[in-house]
C-alpha cells in the first residue's frame, strides 16, 4: 500500500474537476466513489488545505482544525466531503491536501493489512512507522471512532461494570448486533478467549441503530456493539465498557499532515488533539444530529469551550 501511495506522490498529482475524480475511481476500482463536493486542489500557494471524508463527524473535526489554524494566523482552504479513503489518500500523498482527520486503527489496516496491533498506543506507533514519504501523523486524541461494547447505565450500576471483563459476573448475557458480528474476531469467540466472557447472540440488522438501542434498553439483549462516537451515547442511559486487553482495534482520531506543515501549525493541531476526548466527539456529533448545528458552529463553540483559538 505504501508503494501505491508513493506512485501518486512521485508524480506530484493533482485532481481537478469531475475528470480527475473519475480517473481516481477507475484507478482504484471504487464503486460509487462520488462525493458531495468536487476537489479543486490548492488555489493559493501559501494556504493550508484541510480536507475531510464524506462523513459528517469527520467534517466537524476538519473544521475544528481549520478554525484553530485560521485563528493562529494561517490562511486555510477547505476541501470537505471529498470521498472515502480510497479516493482521498492519493490526494494527501500527492501533497494536494495538508491536514486530514483520520482514525489510527482504520488507517493502519489500510496501509498495512497485516498489522496485528490493537491497543491504542501500539496502533499509533505502528501507524507512524508506515506513513508514506512526505506524510506524518500529529498527536492522537483520546477521542475515538471505533466499535465498542455498550450496556445500559442501570445494568452497569447493578453489576458494577467498568470494563469488558466485568461482564463475566452477568448471567444471562446476550450480545446483539449485525449478524456478521457473530464471526468477527472481537465477537462472542473473542469475548470468551480474551476476557472469559460467554455470551449468547441475537442478530439485529441495523448496524447499531435505533433497533439495537431499543433491544438493549428493553433488556431483549444485555450487550451491544455501537460506535464509540455515536451521539446516542450522550443520553446518559448507556455506558461504554473499557477494553484494557485490546480486544477491539483502537481507532483514535489522528490528524495526517503533509510536509508543508511547519512546527507552529503542528503545535496548534496538537493542542486540539490534546483537548479532544471521547465525550467531546460524542457531544459534537449530538449537536450535529440532534440540534442540526453546522460543522462551523460546532467547531467554533467547542474551541471556545476549551479556551483554544477560534473564529
PLM regions: where:
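A bilobed periplasmic-binding-protein/Venus flytrap-type ligand-binding module shared by bacterial periplasmic
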Residues: 147-157, 250-263
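Bilobed "Venus flytrap"/periplasmic-binding protein-like clamshell domains
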Residues: 47-77, 82, 142-212, 293-297
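C-terminal motif of bacterial Sec signal peptides marking the signal peptidase cleavage site
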Residues: 27-32
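Paired acidic/hydrophobic, glycine-rich loop segments that form the ligand-binding mouth/hinge
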Residues: 98-102, 221-227
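Bacterial signal peptide processing site
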Residues: 34-37
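Bacterial N-terminal signal peptides that target proteins for export
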Residues: 2-21
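An extracytoplasmic/periplasmic, membrane-proximal ligand-sensing/linker region
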Residues: 57, 184-187, 194, 267-311
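Ligand-binding "clamshell"
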Residues: 111-138, 220-223, 232-245
Amino acid at each position: 500500500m505504501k508503494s501505491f501511495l508513493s506512485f501518486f506522490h512521485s508524480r506530484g498529482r493533482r485532481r481537478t474537476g469531475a475528470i480527475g475524480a473519475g480517473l481516481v475511481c477507475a484507478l482504484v476500482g471504487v464503486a460509487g466513489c462520488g462525493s458531495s463536493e468536487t476537489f479543486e486542489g490548492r488555489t493559493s500557494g501559501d494556504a493550508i488545505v484541510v480536507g475531510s471524508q464524506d462523513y459528517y463527524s469527520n467534517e466537524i473535526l476538519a473544521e475544528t482544525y481549520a478554525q484553530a489554524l485560521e485563528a493562529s494566523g494561517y490562511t486555510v482552504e477547505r476541501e470537505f466531503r471529498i470521498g472515502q479513503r480510497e479516493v482521498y489518500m492519493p490526494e494527501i500523498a500527492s501533497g494536494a491536501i495538508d491536514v486530514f482527520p483520520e482514525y489510527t486503527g482504520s488507517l493502519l489496516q489500510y496501509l498495512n493489512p497485516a498489522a496485528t496491533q490493537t491497543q491504542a498506543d501500539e496502533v499509533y506507533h505502528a501507524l507512524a512507522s508506515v506513513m508514506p514519504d512526505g506524510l506524518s501523523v500529529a498527536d492522537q486524541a483520546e477521542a475515538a471512532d471505533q466499535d465498542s461494547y455498550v450496556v445500559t447505565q442501570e445494568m452497569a450500576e447493578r453489576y458494577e461494570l467498568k470494563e469488558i471483563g466485568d461482564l463475566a459476573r452477568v448471567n444471562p448475557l446476550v450480545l446483539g448486533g449485525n449478524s456478521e458480528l457473530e464471526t468477527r474476531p472481537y465477537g462472542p469467540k473473542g469475548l470468551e478467549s480474551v476476557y472469559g466472557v460467554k455470551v449468547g447472540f441475537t442478530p439485529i440488522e441495523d448496524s447499531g441503530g435505533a433497533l439495537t438501542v431499543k433491544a438493549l434498553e428493553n433488556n431483549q439483549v444485555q450487550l451491544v456493539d455501537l460506535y464509540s462516537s455515536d451521539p446516542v451515547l450522550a443520553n446518559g442511559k448507556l455506558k461504554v465498557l473499557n477494553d484494557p486487553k485490546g480486544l477491539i482495534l483502537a481507532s483514535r482520531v489522528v490528524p495526517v499532515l503533509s510536509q508543508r506543515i511547519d512546527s507552529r501549525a503542528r503545535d496548534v493541531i496538537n493542542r486540539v488533539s490534546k483537548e479532544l476526548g471521547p465525550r467531546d466527539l460524542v457531544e459534537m456529533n449530538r449537536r450535529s444530529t440532534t440540534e442540526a448545528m453546522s460543522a462551523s458552529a460546532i467547531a467554533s463553540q467547542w474551541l471556545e469551550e476549551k479556551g483554544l483559538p477560534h473564529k
